[in-house]
């Protein structure tokens, strides 16, 4: 539920001057503020970072209280955050997390949007999404490589590895979906991305994630045709409503080469524009008549999925990109809604089996050169991965930093801790101007239970078992992460996921090195453990290769 907007402009401090008692508390302070940087957040005035109503703090009073608490927090104290509000400071020890966050968690019987929204209206909860409430969102770059890897794998499986002259049709250009146009172009294919909010298109144009836009379907298709004919991939934003435009494209007989969707369908009230509604009426009625909005949005999503199914029937490779739109359509009577797969079981799970996932870091100095130096260090430490090197080169060339300079690359067990230790040494030697923080998306190998996304179609049927993210969070606390978060409902909405996050600060000290080695080994190892337990041979082999002690693993 929106709170009164605040006109303050929040940006993270830069440089080496501390505003807190140590770098271990300066790091969460800067990353909290970075989440609300106007170049990062979708609606910073409302504390909304991305993903519909994913917030960094419950309200502005809570934000100010968090900042004040972090500034006075001692090296042996831990701050507790309950759904975006600071609720306690307790004495722990120097290797304990400095901040523990629990966001949007509800007892399962009450884990639905109606109950959450009631609590939100009363000021008792907030929706943390994944990296909004856990203070490690880095702008659209945070999802670019995962999206790029998915599109590359789609091209490999469906088009012989060559996407030249092909085009992708999708929708949604918010904080997550906004990565699609750039990821598509980087993967070598043109992209037509439908978006209903002009502000989101403007944001993607301003940050370099979108090449062009129009509000005319014929012009958009003409630009796509020109791109495909030239063999030079281009991204085109189309202002409109996906549930209206996809059927029109079908009527024209135009078939894309790939199809997906990243609208905010996880939130039927705040995330999806109903058919034949304008944005202004939608925003007003979200407050005055949310039930009517939800009913209309759900019907529109069903129409959207029916169109996707028809594209699939006509031979277009079609994939759900994790926004729960298939589930809504199924609930609305689309019996075959799950006939097209989710992206994780279709393309990503083999990576998860090896603990490979979205490894990200941010330079607290604010100096882009710190990121460029770490890019080079990654290449030095992982010399035999040309795909990774290509990614880093493309990222430097194509990705504009939003807020504090940051980088993401997908690496796994055996590499993450080596990179963390190297970054820490670079801080200690002065090669980096200030500490860096290392974190990840909650979408990772061992940190999420989400039966319609990350854990869809698990081999042993354990899709809904959420012990795993709880164990991941506990393990990261015990290992010494700088802050640890446990959330509910990210990506797919209330009742459909539980997930955990961690961030570790590399401040150049020997104590940090010990924590880094534990955290950045144990965190991906828990993902290998989870998949080995589910019976995946790749994960079992990885566990044995890395000497993991898994008592239930036979042989």
Swiss-Prot record:
Pathway field of the UniProt record reads: Amino-acid degradation; L-histidine degradation into L-glutamate; N-formimidoyl-L-glutamate from L-histidine: step 2/3
Spell out the PROSITE patterns in the cross-references. Answer: UROCANASE
Q: Does the keyword Lyase apply?
A: yes
The reaction(s) catalysed by this protein are: 4-imidazolone-5-propanoate = trans-urocanate + H2O
Chain sites annotated for binding NAD(+): 51-52, 129, 175-177, 195, 241-242, 262-266, 272-273, 321, 491
Main localization, broad class: cytoplasm
* Free-text cofactor note: Binds 1 NAD(+) per subunit.
InterPro entries hit by this protein: Urocanase (IPR055351), Urocanase-like (IPR023637), Urocanase_C (IPR035401), Urocanase_central_sf (IPR038364), Urocanase_CS (IPR023636), Urocanase_N (IPR035400), Urocanase_Rossmann-like (IPR035085), Urocanase_sf (IPR036190)
Q: What does this protein do?
A: Catalyzes the conversion of urocanate to 4-imidazolone-5-propionate.
The name under which this protein is listed is Urocanate hydratase
**Organism field:** Hyphomonas neptunium (strain ATCC 15444)
């Amino acid at each position: 539920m929106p709170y009164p907007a605040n006109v303050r402009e929040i940006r993270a401090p830069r440089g080496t001057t501390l505003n807190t008692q140590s770098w271990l508390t300066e790091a969460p302070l800067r990353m909290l503020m970075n989440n609300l940087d106007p170049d990062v957040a979708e609606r910073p005035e409302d504390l909304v970072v991305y993903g519909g109503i994913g917030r960094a703090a419950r309200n502005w009073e809570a934000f100010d209280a968090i900042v004040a608490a972090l500034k006075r927090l001692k090296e042996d104290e831990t701050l507790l955050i309950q759904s975006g509000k600071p609720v306690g400071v307790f004495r722990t020890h120097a290797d304990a997390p400095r901040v523990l966050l629990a966001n949007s968690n509800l007892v399962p019987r009450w884990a639905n949007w109606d109950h959450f929204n009631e609590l939100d209206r009363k000021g008792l909860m907030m929706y943390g999404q994944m990296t909004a409430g856990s203070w490690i969102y880095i702008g659209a770059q945070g999802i670019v490589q995962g999206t790029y890897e998915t599109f590359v794998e789609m091209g490999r499986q469906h088009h012989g590895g060559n996407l030249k002259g092909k085009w992708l049709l999708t929708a949604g250009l918010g904080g997550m979906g906004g990565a699609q146009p750039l990821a598509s172009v980087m993967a070598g294919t043109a992209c037509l991305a439908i978006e209903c909010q002009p502000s989101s298109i403007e944001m993607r144009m301003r940050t370099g994630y979108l090449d062009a836009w129009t509000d005319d379907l014929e012009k958009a298709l003409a630009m796509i045709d020109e791109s495909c004919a030239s063999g030079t991939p281009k991204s085109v934003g189309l202002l409109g409503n996906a549930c209206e435009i996809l059927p029109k494209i079908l009527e024209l007989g135009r078939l894309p080469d790939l199809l997906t969707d990243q609208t905010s369908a996880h939130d039927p009230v705040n995330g999806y524009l109903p058919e034949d509604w304008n944005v202004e009426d939608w925003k007003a009625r979200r407050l005055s008549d949310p039930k009517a909005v939800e009913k209309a949005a759900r019907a529109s999503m069903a129409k959207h999925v029916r169109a996707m199914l028809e594209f699939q029937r006509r031979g277009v490779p079609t994939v759900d990109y994790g926004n729960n739109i298939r589930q809504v359509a199924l609930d609305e009577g689309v019996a075959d809604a799950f006939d097209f797969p989710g992206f994780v079981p279709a393309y990503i799970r083999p990576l998860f089996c090896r603990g490979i996932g979205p490894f990200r870091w941010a330079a607290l100095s604010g100096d882009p050169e710190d990121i460029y130096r770490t890019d080079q260090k990654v290449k030095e430490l992982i010399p035999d991965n040309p795909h990774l090197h290509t990614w880093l080169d493309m990222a430097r060339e194509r990705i504009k930093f939003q807020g504090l300079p940051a980088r993401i690359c997908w690496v796994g067990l055996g590499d993450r801790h080596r990179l963390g230790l190297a970054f820490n040494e670079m801080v200690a030697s002065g090669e980096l101007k200030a500490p860096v923080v290392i974190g990840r998306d909650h979408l990772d190998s061992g940190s999420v239970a989400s039966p319609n996304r990350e854990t869809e179609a698990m081999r042993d049927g354990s899709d809904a078992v959420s012990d795993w993210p709880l164990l991941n969070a506990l393990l990261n606390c015990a290992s010494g992460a700088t802050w640890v978060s446990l959330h509910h409902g990210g990506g797919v909405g209330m009742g459909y996921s539980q997930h955990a996050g961690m961030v570790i600060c590399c401040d150049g000290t020997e104590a940090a090195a010990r924590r880094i080695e534990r955290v950045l080994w144990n965190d991906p190892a828990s993902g290998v453990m989870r998949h080995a337990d589910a019976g995946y041979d790749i994960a079992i082999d990885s566990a044995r290769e890395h000497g993991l002690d898994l008592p239930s693993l036979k042989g």
